[in-house]
Amino acid sequence: MIKLTIAIATCLVLCLVLLLPSSNISYRHKYDLPTNGLNDSEQQSEKLLGGLLATGFEEKSCLSRYDQSMSKPSPYKPSRHIVSKLRSYEMLHKRCGPGTKAYKRATKQLGHNELSSSGDECRYVVWMPMFGLGNRMLSLVSVFLYALLTDRVMLVDQRNDITDLFCEPFPETSWLLPLDFPLNDQLDSFNREHSRCYGTMLKNHGINSTSIIPSHLYLDIFHDSRDHDKKFFCEEDQAFLDKVTWLVVKSNLYFVPSLWMIPSFQTKLIKLFPQKETVFHHLARYLFHPTNQVWGMVTRSYNAYLSRADERLGIQVRVFSKPVGYFQHVMDQILYSDHLKNMFLEQASSTGETIEVYQPSGEKIQQTDKKLHDQKALAEIYLLSLTDELVTSTRSTFGYVAQGLGGLKPWILYEPRDKKTPNPPCVRAMSMEPCFLRAPLHGCQAKTIKIPPFVRICEDWKTGLKLVDVSDEL
């Protein structure tokens, strides 16, 4: 007899500038450990995600890094080019990262306009956490890909809770921006009105072919960024930015699709990712390794409620309510898991399956930057990623991350209008890639939008772009 487990997780998800509730429901297949039937070499390859992960880490300090016992082997294998690029990046980060002579030289240049260029100097991109956890993970992967393409070292602002969520991803070095970084007291003040904002400098004609190269610039890549800020995605602007030692990025978006629209990047990206829809899947599994505390939440929930199921389905429901508030219809939707539990306890399914309903947590308000709340949210994302099938909601960054980590093409629930179910109510995603919700659909990229066959308008948002593999389109 088939056993179907339904796990329901509730949390509030912050997407774009709105505080939006979401409910997550999880169900899934029971697997034997993925190493069963594999020889030693195949087991090692699976442990390292086909070569994505480096060896040399102390395993007990970050159990999630090599633990594949709860997931199926991914059918998407990384190319030898991305594996080689990651190993090269690790060497670069080790040579240029915090505490090195190169890092100290680079920080001394901050505040000076006349920059010495010796050819072997290191360049950096600093990631700043913005908005909710889903937005942060999407933008972090985007910035990391930009670092790979431009041979920069990526450092992340550690002043929030990132060390409570994720282990260090790079061997024998740190991705954390040191607390004594010379610009630390200015980072929070970086905005589009700042004198070092690239878009503002363009708007004020502060940058031209004869401009002195600044030591650092701030890049504003948000859902409401101005046209001048979107010049970041233009080839000629990248040529200028390439000369700047320090870039600071604030973003709440997955802007990877538009990196593919930059001609000099596209050539590299096609080699790195011959399967276009695997960018987030590979880079997220490389970068993100939950801390032991978070991984404990995942494994305890999985082993207690999901491991014995024959099939698991994850449902992530995002509620669109304006103005943001505590509405009864929202709570009715969140508490629907209790109704499902009672229904399946009182009567069997028509085909005889055993069906269970599970709700990992019951968070009712968004509490970004509160340690335990963010840890629970991350654990729920991973539980959703461990499903066989996934249903997500329109424009949900929470859902985007789960589908990408799990290598899943979800069914996407359309946004209700006037509290009525749309017809049709959902659509199958073209790919497992997240949507760049506010892609620059005009300007320097307007002429190239229709050319690449691997870029499509998102199913869930008409101003968004996503990567697809054309042969896999439905």
From Swiss-Prot:
What is the species listed in this Swiss-Prot or TrEMBL entry? Arabidopsis thaliana (Mouse-ear cress)
EC number in record: 2.4.1.-
Q: Which family does it belong to?
A: Belongs to the glycosyltransferase 37 family.
Q: Which GO terms describe its molecular function?
A: fucosyltransferase activity; galactoside 2-alpha-L-fucosyltransferase activity
Residues passing through the membrane, by range: 1-21
* Keywords per UniProt: Cell wall biogenesis/degradation, Glycoprotein, Glycosyltransferase, Golgi apparatus, Membrane, Signal-anchor, Transferase, Transmembrane, Transmembrane helix
Q: Which PANTHER family match?
A: FUCOSYLTRANSFERASE 2-RELATED, FUCOSYLTRANSFERASE 9-RELATED
Name of the protein in its database record: Probable fucosyltransferase 9
